[in-house]
Amino acid sequence: MNQRIWINIALLVVIFVLSVIIFFNKHEIEDELLPLSSINPKSIININVQRKNLDNLFFSKSDGVWNMITPLQFQANRARIESILKILETKSYKQFNLDEVDIAQFALRSPAVILELNENKFSFGTNNPINQRRYILFDKKIHMIDDFHFPQLTTKAAYFAETKLLPDTMNIISIRFPEYTIQLNNGKWQASIPEYNEEKVKKIINKWKEIIAISVSKYEKQEGQKTITINSMSGQEINFAIVTTDPYLILGREDLGIQYNMGMDDAKQMFLKTYLKN
């Protein structure tokens, strides 16, 4: 090999070694960063989100279950609540004492969002234009953290709803569809349309027990919409409005103010006779 090739190989080796050193140094530095707080997420039972120009959100935990109390009332999605609580353990990349800075430069004099976890308050300011990390005020210090939480806290209330249509504890005894009914009769599942056997009906029941929506949005009532009514052994009754079937199935809970956007494959397995147009 000529000298130029050897020089190029040496340069590549140097670049590789430097990249490895930078990579591991970065991770060592991040490992040394302190968490934003020492608060145990499991100790939190109330979440209050005050939002400028948006509805405030309030969640409360009872018997291990999170529920939204305002502006809507429904069981909250556990994973999305846990995502909020992760702010307690997020890394603080930089801190400023309040007597060293003007909080106005961080847009913290009138925060866009104030998150209260029990009695602990986190005020959200602007983000850093270079690294896009967010400035927040907590425990009399301004911290710079990864900006994962602000977008979530400024989304619509329905985003936090549980995506599973029925509670795990619901023991179904009947489902009334617009044109037919399936119900438990003397320990056997039957349909009001006789061409369907018990095995087929059981599959429908099991699908409703486990079905999960792709997403949840604010309820939008439509004229002439039909209703699906589900009854349980305990006497509970849940009504789903068929908001639309085109281009995909949307089921509404008018009592909760939300609607479920269903996947096409799942939707086809929820009915004996399909309402889908595709």
PLM regions: where:
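A short-motif feature that recognizes glycine-rich, charge-decorated loops
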Residues: 1-278
